[in-house]
């Protein structure tokens, strides 16, 4: 298709003037004179056969036609600028946007990211965290890493690994725990899922509905583990996500009993294809997950 000549300088002059509602400020941004900007806008109006601005004593006001044109130009220039940025340093750079549960991001993904960057230096990874409730389409994500059973409407889900829950606490509290029954004398920290402690009690040989003295509910495992580290109570959390704290012994695992309530999954929209950057990340993540699964 042969495109008509596009008056790019005039379009840039209009877009800058419309954002600032001022020829003078647009001229400063574009490093040209105010007269040059005014001339370019006038030439665009003549080409289109419509007025794009109302010239007022104290500035400019967009006409209906100008208001229609502005968002299209802003989006187009932003997309061009974003594409040019991907060639920084003489190489095309792919952008990959991944959303992940905060606990997974901090406890498992970040310690391994250096390896991904070394293998794929021209992929710009953008990470966002969520609390497992995520809208992939609305948030513009390529992938979302979630915890659960793997069934999310409209998504393809690839299993990474299970992350069983176990008891974690500070060393001072661990010294007081000689049997699972001793937990009933402590504040129990948990997520919004009320069934986790009953499931663990049952696995440890206690009544599933053992009487609890005190409990605190957290919306993230990161906050819950920090509370446990500070001696606020005893947490039930995935040990795999807190390997560094266990290695440094700032957190202890007093009992071997663990209970599985789900797995981590790599999910994407079924309605969209996978880019080369997505395929690279998926392959790397599945490789790392396989190593994690073998190590359990």
UniProtKB/Swiss-Prot annotation:
Changing residue 46 to A: Does not affect the activation of ampC transcription. Able to bind the ampC promoter in the presence and absence of beta-lactams. One of its GO terms (biological process) is positive regulation of protein secretion. It comes from the Bacteria. It is found in: Cytoplasm; Membrane. InterPro entries: AmpR_PBP2, LysR_subst-bd, Tscrpt_reg_HTH_LysR, WH-like_DNA-bd_sf, WH_DNA-bd_sf. Residues 23-42 bind DNA. Residues 91-289 form the LysR substrate-binding domain. Changing residue 43 to A: Does not affect the activation of ampC transcription. Able to bind the ampC promoter in the presence and absence of beta-lactams. One of its GO terms (molecular function) is sequence-specific DNA binding. Keywords: Activator, Cytoplasm, DNA-binding, Membrane, Transcription, Transcription regulation. SUPFAM superfamilies: Periplasmic binding protein-like II, Winged helix' DNA-binding domain. The keyword Cytoplasm applies. CDD domains: PBP2_LTTR_beta_lactamase (cd08484). Changing residue 102 to E: Abolishes the activation of ampC transcription, probably as a result of destabilization of the protein. Induction: Up-regulated by beta-lactams. Expression is negatively regulated by sigma factor RpoN, possibly through promoter blocking. The keyword Transcription applies. Residues 83-296 are annotated as: Includes the LysR substrate-binding / effector-binding domain, involved in binding to specific cell-wall-derived muropeptide products, some of which have signaling functions, leading to disparate responses such as antibiotic resistance, virulence, and host cell inflammation. GO terms for cellular component: cytoplasm; membrane. Residues 6-63 form the HTH lysR-type domain. Effector binding domain recognizes specific cell-wall-derived muropeptide products, probably acting as a link between cell-wall recycling/repair and the induction of resistance to beta-lactam antibiotics. Homodimer. Orthologs in several species of Enterobacteria, but no known ortholog in E.coli. Belongs to the LysR transcriptional regulatory family. Transcription regulator that plays a critical role in the expression of beta-lactamase AmpC, acting by positive regulation of the ampC gene. Has a wider role in the regulation of expression of genes involved in proteolysis, quorum sensing, and virulence. Acts by binding directly to the promoter region of the ampC gene. Probably does not regulate transcription of its own gene. This is HTH-type transcriptional activator AmpR. The gene is ampR.
